[in-house]
Amino acid sequence: EDAKIDKLLGLTSGVIMIVGPTGSGKSSTMYTLVRELLSDRTNLITLEDPVEYHIKGATQVQINEKVGLTFASGLRSILRQDPDIIMIGELRDQETASIAVQASITGHLVVSTLHTNSSASTITRLEDMGIESYLIADSVIGVIAQRLVRRLCPFCKKPKQATRRSEEHTSELQSPACIS
C-alpha cells in the first residue's frame, strides 16, 4: 500500500482525492501527503477554509468570502503563480472542481478532499458537480477513501469469541486497498 501511495506521489500532474465521511481524517491525510511532496524546489500553494495546520515552505491562503476570496477566485489567482502543487481544502462546487481539473490537465498536481463515502462515489459526485466523465478520466490519478474505526471504551468492552464470518470480514478489511 505504501508503494502505491509513493508511486502516486511521484506523479507531477493530476488530481489526488482524499474522500470519506465527516470526521474521517481526510484533512490529516491530505496534510501528510503534501508534506511528503514538499521540497526546497517545490512551489506548493494551498487554499483552505480555515487553514488547519502550518506547512513550512508552503504559501497558505485562507478563504475569505466577505472580501470575495472564494475557492474558485483563489484558485484562478494561484494558477498565475505557477505552482507545482495545489492543495485545495475541499472541492465544494462546480466552478472550483472544474478549475482544479483544468489545472491538473495543464501540468499541476492537485490534492483535495471530497465528502463521499467511497472511491466509486467520488466519480459520481464529480459528475454531479458538472465535470464531464472524459475530464475525470483524464485528470483523476488517485482516490484515497478512508474512515476511522471506532474505539471501544476500555471500561465497557467485553471479550467475545470471533465467529468464522467475523474473521473473514476482518481479513477482508486488512487486505491492501486499490490505489491506481
PLM regions and their residue ranges:
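Positively charged, low-complexity/disordered segments
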Residues: 168-180
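Short, flexible helix-loop junctions that flank or precede catalytic/ligand sites
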Residues: 1-167, 171
